[in-house]
């Protein structure tokens, strides 16, 4: 696997060409704050989701009168990116439309994924360019899996606390699609105590109201200050018993149960005019 390593005096990050996916996020003492990718549970670490978030009905999307096979979270995470820029503290990987991508998604695009270090923070930015001559619908998101418990937080309870103090409604998946019936918020005054039992029914989705930032970690130990830009939807996910929690800011969600397979009809779909550019990012700062 081709890896690019970036580092500063505080952090080291490894990024793979496959999916432009972060593979490790380590502090100077060698502790990795990112999930290890243990195949017993889940081999992912920090996939980039494009051009779709979540599932489509029967894993099929339609664009106009044409139908295309599209697996969960799109194809970017399984695609080989090209390294186009590398410096000590940042790197950029690129994926461009090709005959292979147009067989699944009939649009011309460029997707640049940058990883950049600033002190004890890593900033990941996806820049999407519509290189075609028609409006391009898409979904995009991030899926970073952080260690649970965090290094140095073993034996301590962990929580997620929203910066906005909100209590967003919870939505659940049914067969990989969003059940449109809202449930009571599991947050109390912006705080959710993490419990593996809460994920026995798959991910916890918060399409609206989660704001733009949170703190994940233990109350008196290590934590991560996590924020995002231009991504209105949010989800939490793990596999019960696994040592990670995914903090997932999205633009777009899975299709709804009973909903259309049309890409432009999916909830929270984004649209780029010909020649336009969209930017999306998250920032994770390690504390403690």
Model region roles, listed by residue range:
Residues 218-258:
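Glycine-rich active-site loops that engage anionic ligands at enzyme catalytic sites
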Residues 112-114, 267-272:
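Beta-strand-rich interaction surfaces with strong enrichment in secreted/lumenal proteins
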Residues 97-146, 151:
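Acidic, contiguous internal or C-terminal segments within carbohydrate-active enzymes
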Residues 61-65, 270-287:
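Short Pro-Gly-centered flexible turn/kink motifs
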Residues 45-51, 257-265:
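Short, structured beta-strand/loop micro-motifs enriched in basic residues and often containing a Trp
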Residues 12-67:
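Acidic-aromatic substrate-binding/catalytic surfaces of carbohydrate-active enzymes
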Residues 145-229:
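Active-site/ligand-binding surface loops and adjacent short beta/alpha elements
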Residues 66-119:
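Extended, loop-rich substrate-binding clefts of extracytoplasmic carbohydrate-active enzymes
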